Curated annotation (Swiss-Prot):
Span(s) of short sequence motif C2HC 1: 189-216
Record field: compositional bias (Basic and acidic residues): 256-267
Native organism taxonomy: Eukaryota, Metazoa, Chordata, Craniata, Vertebrata
Name of the gene encoding the protein in the UniProt record: Nanos1
Organism: Mus musculus
Gene Ontology CC terms, in alphabetical order: cytoplasm; perinuclear region of cytoplasm
GO biological process terms on file: cell migration; cerebellar neuron development; epithelial cell migration; mRNA destabilization; post-transcriptional regulation of gene expression; regulation of cell growth; tissue homeostasis
Keyword Zinc: yes
Assembly behavior: Interacts with PUM2, SNAPIN and CTNNB1. Interacts (via N-terminal region) with CTNND1. Interacts with DDX20 (via N-terminal region).
Designated name of the protein: Nanos homolog 1
Superkingdom: Eukaryota
Main localization (coarse): cytoplasm
Length: 267
């Protein structure tokens, strides 16, 4: 059996990574001495995410100086491969600089204006609509509206005004009116619905208008057999005024005295 001469392993593989030690500034550096285990702390940044975010933010804004934590020495873990491409850290830095640029976010740009969040989350409001100001008690009074108008004249804003600002007649609406505004205005004719008509027919109109006139086209063509009413005053026999009048009681004719006498037998 042929034996191969022993050859020493390459120094590249024989080199072991230096031990890592955690410094108080939450960065990893190589430690020459033995590492003493430390208790785990949930408030300690073991991964150094704060450093990455600070570097990315400082790299994206050249006018600002480096952060307070960027002044300390930072050393990453030793590289095991000496032939690594030197352009990878730059590419990673550019990626982090674009991905972690928090100042590019619209919400982090500065303090939000008073009406900005209201307009953004207006679609998520379950009471969005005409009656929202009445139910939630946020309808402005006359003095508030006048003050807002004067402020708008001094410092005009480009944002559109709320929907309830253009309708001052809702300010004095009662609770019943607010409840009615929340209900969907569906047109249902009870006469056609009770007669088993199609849904497409009885949802296009109502039975009677606010003034009491009959609006149903089917009922308007009907003529009451008792009173002959039709058109605006059309109704069925059940709702006819004559059907509610009790009929006169019929009394039997009075009996005569001759009929009251007992009959005699004829011989």
């Amino acid at each position: 059996m042929e034996a191969f001469p022993w050859a020493p392993r390459s120094p590249r593989r024989a080199r072991a990574p230096a031990p890592m030690a955690l410094v108080p500034s939450a960065r990893y550096v190589s430690a020459s001495g033995p590492v003493h285990p430390q208790p785990f702390s949930s408030w300690n940044d073991y991964l150094g995410l704060a450093t990455l975010i600070t570097r990315a933010s400082d790299r994206g804004s050249p006018h600002e100086g480096p952060g307070p934590t960027a002044a300390g020495p930072t050393m990453g873990p030793p590289e095991d491969d000496e032939d690594d491409d030197g352009e990878e850290p730059e590419a990673g830095g550019r990626y982090l600089g674009g991905a972690l640029e928090l100042r590019a976010l619209e919400l982090c740009a500065g303090p939000a204006e008073p009406g900005l969040l209201e307009e953004r989350f207006a679609e998520l409001n379950p009471f969005a609509g005409r009656a929202a100001a009445v139910l939630l008690g946020c309808a402005p009074t006359a003095s508030t509206t006048a003050a807002a108008a004067s402020t708008a004249e001094v410092t005009p804003r480009e944002e559109p005004s709320p929907a309830w600002a253009a309708e001052p007649r809702l300010h004095a609406a009662s609770g019943a009116t607010a409840a009615r505004l929340l209900k969907p205005e569906l047109q249902v004719c009870v006469f056609c619905r009770n007669n088993k008509e199609a849904v497409a027919l009885y949802t296009t109109h109502i039975l009677k208008g606010p003034d009491g006139r009959v609006l149903c086209p089917v009922l308007r063509r009907y003529t009451c057999p008792l009173c002959g009413a039709s058109g605006d005053n059309a109704h069925t026999i059940k709702y006819c005024p004559l059907s509610k009048v009790p009929p006169p009681t019929v009394r039997p004719p009075p009996r005569s005295n001759r009929d009251s006498l007992p009959s005699k037998k004829l011989r």
